[in-house]
Amino acid sequence: MITNRKGGAMEITNIETIPGKKITTHYGVVCGSTVRSKNAFKDIGASFKNMFGGELKNYTRLLEETRQEAISRMIQQATALGANAIVNVRFATSDVAAGAAEIYTYGTAVRVE
């Protein structure tokens, strides 16, 4: 359960239904995406870390923030339609330019009771 920007609750799941609830209305596909680029200065540190192994924490943080922004945009779209849940949520990524990647999330906006 995620609270949307209007203060209401939005249930989000990667399965077709919300367990224990009935879908009463389908609003269709909703999506959210954002494109982020890497920081050139942080890339220098990441290059050294990459040579010796280990987690690239700056990239991990960047991807988490990017995912959250894409989810937030998807929730905004679903809320505007009157949905209180999003089912079948999926994520996709793609390179859109040198050093820049898109995270795209999508699902089906529904109303559940």
Protein language model annotation of sequence segments:
Residues 2-42, 80, 101-113:
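N-terminal presequence-like segments and the immediate start of the first folded domain
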Residues 15-18, 91-96:
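Short, solvent-exposed loop/turn elements at beta->coil junctions and helix N-caps
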Residues 30, 35, 43-90:
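Short, well-ordered alpha-helical segments
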